[in-house]
Amino acid sequence: AYNALAPKGAPNSCEWEQEEPTQEMAGELEDEEEAEEEEAEEEAEAPQAGQKVKKTHVYAQAPLAGEKITANGLQIVSDTQTEGNPVFADPTYQPEPQVGESQWNEAEATAIGGRVLKKTTPMKPCYGSYARPTNKNGGQGILVANNQGALESKVEMQFFAPSGTAMNERNAVQPSIVLYSEDVNMETPDTHISYKPSKTDENSKAMLGQQAMPNRPNYIAFRDNFIGLMYYNSTGNMGVLAGQASQLNAVVDLQDRNTELSYQLLLDSIGDRTRYFSMWNQAVDSYDPDVRIIENHGTEDELPNYCFPLGGIGVTDTYQGIKSNGNGNPQNWTKNDDFAARNEIGVGNNFALEINLNANLWRNFLYSNIALYLPDKLKYTPTNVEISPNPNSYDYMNKRVVAPGLVDCYINLGARWSLDYMENVNPFNHHRNAGLRYRSMLLGNGRYVPFHIQVPQKFFAIKNLLL
């Protein structure tokens, strides 16, 4: 279950590598020619001015305020509560990404913690992302064997200070944010990509803008021809094997569809039809109430509502990565050149805007229950999205999309109007038939099978015998 109001294009807190020119001025190249041999050797080992080096970029949300940040991480309980024994976040699962400020007007915090996915975890939209827990506290870091052979999550702490402070070495640089970075088993079992900025799957700044949409219900698309019988009957209106009913070896003619349907509807009105669904795997045609009067059998969650900032993070500040000098003095921090100079990190809770939920729900309802079941000629393949070439496959049908403006021509002015396609296009109206829909759920993963007119299953053996 996902937040239906979440922006479909928001990324997870993530990292990526990007080539950048070094910071040295180009004029320094002339001085290198006159430098001593030792200095020249040092310069040869370091990146030359104008050369491009790969640096890590960060886009993340740090929601949890703590007491202070040291080389041990984020202190989450005050000294007064622990009588001088500081308690730091457990890197295997803290700070928990869903825990933040309890109210919108919290005072400004100076020590903030959060979690971020390493650049080695593939970027996916936050909507639909899932990573299975790997420890009893719900932490999701991938477990790696340590020197003793025990499995543990490889969580690394990354420290950040405002760029304006960290760029000047003469300042007393102090971390204001610590991000706990980890690799997770990233999956998207219930969604698929609907917009992809690039054909490559590599982590990059452009890939922050991916968008996802939910997988549609996986129904099989063929019309009912009374394959099998819903009710056991004593030969009054249908042909059956004599041994099962009247003990006479006689076969009567199969009634036409209208006679059969009338009998099914009669039984439906006087008994509990549902008990026979699984037994006989059969449908009664419910076209009129379920097609003309639309019920919801879609996910109702395909279109964005834009309740939150599109990036899912909102207002960010620019931070520079820093690192401890390693001499044990918590006051000694210096710039970390492995990170880019500008890392965008949001602090605290997200901003949110109120919208017309009823209007959005109605539009989503129409998109889920009408647009996604329209003929393929009205659909298109999203740019850069890999899709099966087989138009009868679930992958193809699931990933093709319709222009959302199409459902805006549906009219609802106190009466039941519908698009022409809703009335006369099959398999669009297949999933509106209660019995067909249920049978499709029973039969499984495929969405399309070729079919022909068939007689009830009990007659297959007789038909063969007569031949």
Curated annotation (Swiss-Prot):
It comes from the Viruses. One of its GO terms (biological process) is symbiont entry into host cell. SUPFAM superfamilies: Group II dsDNA viruses VP (SSF49749). Residues 16-45 have a biased composition (Acidic residues). The keyword RNA-binding does not apply. The keyword Protein biosynthesis does not apply. It is found in: Virion; Host nucleus. Keywords: Capsid protein, Cytoplasmic inwards viral transport, Host nucleus, Host-virus interaction, Late protein, Microtubular inwards viral transport, T=25 icosahedral capsid protein, Virion, Virus entry into host cell. Residues 1-54 are annotated as: Disordered. Pfam families: Adeno_hexon (PF01065). InterPro entries: Adenovirus_Pll_hexon_N (IPR016107), Adenovirus_Pll_hexon_sub2 (IPR044942), VP_dsDNA_II (IPR016112). Induction: Expressed in the late phase of the viral replicative cycle. All late proteins expressed from the major late promoter are produced by alternative splicing and alternative polyadenylation of the same gene giving rise to non-overlapping ORFs. A leader sequence is present in the N-terminus of all these mRNAs and is recognized by the viral shutoff protein to provide expression although conventional translation via ribosome scanning from the cap has been shut off in the host cell. Major capsid protein that self-associates to form 240 hexon trimers, each in the shape of a hexagon, building most of the pseudo T=25 capsid. Assembled into trimeric units with the help of the chaperone shutoff protein. Transported by pre-protein VI to the nucleus where it associates with other structural proteins to form an empty capsid. Might be involved, through its interaction with host dyneins, in the intracellular microtubule-dependent transport of incoming viral capsid to the nucleus. Belongs to the adenoviridae hexon protein family. Homotrimer. Interacts with the capsid vertex protein; this interaction binds the peripentonal hexons to the neighboring penton base. Interacts with the hexon-linking protein; this interaction tethers the hexons surrounding the penton to those situated in the central plate of the facet. Interacts with the hexon-interlacing protein; this interaction lashes the hexons together. Interacts with host dyneins DYNC1LI1 and DYNC1I2; this interaction might be involved in intracellular microtubule-dependent transport of incoming viral capsid. This is Hexon protein. It comes from Human adenovirus C serotype 1.
